[in-house]
Amino acid sequence: GTDGSGYDAIIRPVGGTRNQLKAEDLELKMCEDGRMRHQLQTRMKGMDVFSFAITTAPKSIKQLAEQYELSLDDVDYYVLHQANRMINEKIRAKLKQSEEKFPYNMMTFGNTSSASIPLTIITQLAKETLERTLSIIGCGFGVGLSWGTVYFELSNPIISKLVEL
């Protein structure tokens, strides 16, 4: 889904087609939060993003489970966008699920944006997928504000070794 009313919660003010980059956009200026930035740097309204994530992600996961008659307790793992551990822990608490069902990799890789869900699967769950079929709910959320939730079963996938450049 998407909620365009939150378009400015995570935004790069210039660049692209909406506001094309001009030379003066690269000059550092004092921003509302007291930090010096140029207009090409991303800005985030942290509390708006936090509120969005901890409200929308659990709701989306519950809607998916209801639509497909899944019991949340029967899902092996919940693989969430690895943006912020506090956000993911709040989502986990709202779903009333154990810590073991929420793998993390952000301590190693940080916020890897759209790569965070597959990266978490290959670094945290790959070995277990060779031993048994795993039921997984993935939920990503971010810029826009936008979100997506998926349920899938993973059994003996072909997963390449992690390549670090």
Feature names for model-found ranges:
Residues 1-51, 55, 59, 153-165:
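Condensing-enzyme catalytic core mediating Claisen C-C bond formation in acyl metabolism
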Residues 54-59, 65, 73-165:
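Claisen-condensing/thiolase-fold acyl-transfer catalytic domains that form or cleave C-C bonds
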Residues 49, 64-67:
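Short helix-to-loop capping/linker segments positioned immediately adjacent to catalytic or ligand/cofactor-binding
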